[in-house]
Design a protein with these regions (language model features):
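N-terminal secretory signal peptides
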Residues: 31-100
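Juxtamembrane cytosolic interface motif at the C-terminal end of transmembrane helices
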Residues: 21-26
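Bacterial N-terminal signal peptides that target proteins for export
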Residues: 1-12
């Protein structure tokens, strides 16, 4: 006599906390379900954001790297000089599927100076590949976090400066609306994000409910 053991499919949603970071793990059980865990921002007891540990942002999804050389900006660019931008992978996966940046989204912009010394007034130099700009030393970081409730006064996003030099600050306070959010609200293309400068973000279709209405 043969016996058949019925298959049991377990669908789980696990939430755990590790070192003050909420990590969500969800099995891919339905269309749109996330297939990876998410790293969410950590804060101190006084509300300062903590620098993500162990340079983990360098393992995230690379979005792009605009360049604002000091030599082309009066000797001191506002964000010198390479803007190496990464997005937390779970947030990117959700954005690709929905066209919406979910709460908890983290953009990490690691600044990096051009390789010196420059050989020309515009700050460029010549290497075997040609004349141009080449990445040099790291130079601090800026971080943007989406939290519709915590940052309701600045359009749902919080902006953080972890120094524009090395070493990066271990913690930092959210910036005021006039320092960061105002410019994003006025000029960024989609949900206060400069998607117009990052092709892999800009090519994601808008949700049907907002199609054609992005900034």
């Amino acid at each position: 006599m043969s016996h058949r053991i019925p298959a049991i499919v377990a669908i789980t949603l696990a939430v755990c906390t590790v070192s003050g970071v909420a990590i969500f793990a969800q099995a891919p059980t339905s269309p749109g379900a996330l297939t990876r865990s998410r790293y969410l921002p950590e804060y101190t007891a006084t509300g300062e954001m903590k620098l993500p540990p162990n340079s983990i942002w360098r393992e995230w999804v690379f979005v792009g790297s605009p360049l604002t050389p000091n030599a082309l900006n009066g000797g001191q660019a506002n964000f010198p000089e390479y803007h190496n931008v990464y997005i937390e992978p779970g947030s990117y996966e959700s954005y690709r599927k929905t066209g919406v940046f979910p709460d908890g989204t983290i953009f990490f912009k690691e600044l990096q100076l051009t390789l010196g010394p420059s050989e020309n007034p515009d700050g460029s130099r010549t290497e075997p590949s040609g004349r141009g700009y080449f990445p040099g030393a790291f130079n601090g970081a800026d971080v943007t976090v989406k939290d519709s409730m915590r940052y309701a006064q600045t359009g749902g996003w919080g902006y953080f400066d972890f120094n524009h030099n090395e070493p990066k600050a271990a913690t930092t306070k959210v910036r005021s609306k006039s320092e960061c959010a105002f410019c994003h609200i006025a000029s960024a293309k989609r949900d206060e994000v400069w998607t117009q400068f990052y092709r892999i973000l800009d090519e994601v279709p808008l949700p049907d409910s907002t199609r054609g209405g992005g900034r």
